[in-house]
Amino acid sequence: MYDSSSKIKDLSLAPFGKLQMEISETEMPGIMTIREEYEKLKPFKGAKITGCLHMTIETALLIETLQKLGARIRWCSCNIFSTLDYAAAAVSTLENVSVFAWRGETLEEYWWCVEKALTWGENGEGPDLIVDDGADASYLVHKGAEYEKLYEEKKILPDPESGKNEEERCFLSLIKSSILKNPKKWTNMAKKIIGMSEETTTGVLRVKKIEKNNGLLFTAINVNDSVTKQKYDNIYGCRHSLPDGLMRATDFLISGKIVVICGYGDVGKGCASAMKGLGARVYVTEIDPICAIQAVMEGFNVVTLEEIVEKGDFFITCTGNVDIIKLEHLLKMKNNAVVGNIGHFDDEIQVSDLFNHEGIEIENVKPQVDRVTLPNGNKIIVLAQGRLLNLSCATGHPAFVMSFSFCNQIFAQLELWENRNTGKYEKNKSYILPKELDEKVAFYHLKKLNATLTELDDNQCEFLGVSKTGPFKSEAYRY
C-alpha cells in the first residue's frame, strides 16, 4: 500500500519497477538466500531503519528484504541523479516503507529528502539504525548535533552564506531552519540511534575522521572494507558500469583512445581493467607508490595529469579525494575530450569553477551530458556535472555485484540490532564485519555461478589450523 507521506516522481511507474525487481531477484542470490533464512524469524521486528543509498532496482530489493525481515523503513537516495523513478515508485507501495527520492533533485530538495528520511515523528524522533552510502545521513545527524550545542552555549546559528559551495549552503540552511524549529532535534536523535553501516570508501573516510576526533555519536560498521564488498563491488562493479555509463552518455568508440584513470585503488583497478579490455590506451595517475607499481605491473603507463592532460580522450576520477582535475587542467584539454567521475562525491573535478569561468559556454546535450566550449574554442564533454557517471548516465552496478554489498549491509544491520543491549559494540567506535560473515556472503553466490568448493579433510584442517567451515584466512590476509 502506498504511503502518502512518501515523495516520489510518478507512482504509475510502480508496475514497471516491480517487474524489474522480479527480474533482478534471479541475479541477487545472496539477498534471496537471506530472505529464505530469516523471513520467518522477523529479526528486525520493532526496528526503524533509515536508508540513504542510491534508489535503484537493486536497492529496492534491499529495502524489500529489510521490510520482509520485520523493519519499518524510511529511505532517500544519496545522489541527486541516481534515483530510478520506477524503483522508487515500486518500493513506495510496500507496507511500512516511505520513500523520498526522485531523479534530478535540486541540492535543496536532496537535503530535504535526507531530513525526511531521518525524521520519524512530529517531534523529531529518529531511526534506530542507518544504512548509509557516503555517510550523508549520519553526517547530518552529527553536524546537526554539533551546531545545536554551539547554539545552546553561545546562541550562534550556522551561517548558510559561509558555505564554500551551493551544496554546503543548502546543508547549513537546513540545519539553521531545524534549530529554529527544534533546537535539540539532532542531539536527541543521536542519543537513540544504535548504529549505522557505511557502504563506500568515501563514507568510511568521513566516519573515520569523526571517530579520530572522538566525535562519533553512535556505533559504525564499515561495510566497505568487507572483502566481499571491496573486491567485488569496487572492482567488478566498476568494470561493468563505467563503460556502460560512458557509452550511454557519448556513444564514442573507446578502442584505441587514450583513457586517463585518476587513482588506482580498487575502483581505479576496475575502471582501468574495463578500458583495457575495450582496447583503450590506459594511463594512470597515482600518489601511492604501491598502487602505482601495481598499475605498471598490469601494463599501464603511470604519469602525472600534467603530462597527459592535453592528449587524453577520456578522463575518469576515482580517488575519493578533492580537486583532482582542476580548472587549469580542464582548460587545457583537447577538443571533444570527455570528463567524468566515478568517485562518490562531486568534488574530484572542479566543475563548478569551470561552469562559472569567464568565457565559458555550456550546452546541455541530454540529461547529465553537457558540452562546454572553452575560451580557446575547444569543446569538452562533462558528464553528470562531476557526480557519479555510472549511476547518473546509466543504472550503476549490475544486480549480481550489488547482492554482495547488500548482503553485507543486512548482516551489519543485524549485528547492530541483535547486539544493541549486549555491549559487543561501543557507541563511539567503528568496526568491520567478522570474517565468518564475509565468507558466508561469498558462499551464498557460488551456486549461481555453478562453482563447487573443495572440502578440507581432518589432516589438512589440523595442518592449517582452521575448521572445515572456516574462517579460512586470518584477519591480516590480503586477498
Swiss-Prot record:
UniProt keyword annotation of NAD present: yes
Reaction catalysis annotation: S-adenosyl-L-homocysteine + H2O = L-homocysteine + adenosine
Pathway assigned to this chain's UniProt record: Amino-acid biosynthesis; L-homocysteine biosynthesis; L-homocysteine from S-adenosyl-L-homocysteine: step 1/1
Binding residues for substrate: 56, 133, 199, 229, 233
GO BP: any one term: one-carbon metabolic process
Task performed by this protein: Adenosylhomocysteine is a competitive inhibitor of S-adenosyl-L-methionine-dependent methyl transferase reactions; therefore adenosylhomocysteinase may play a key role in the control of methylations via regulation of the intracellular concentration of adenosylhomocysteine.
Protein name: Adenosylhomocysteinase
UniProt source species: Plasmodium yoelii yoelii
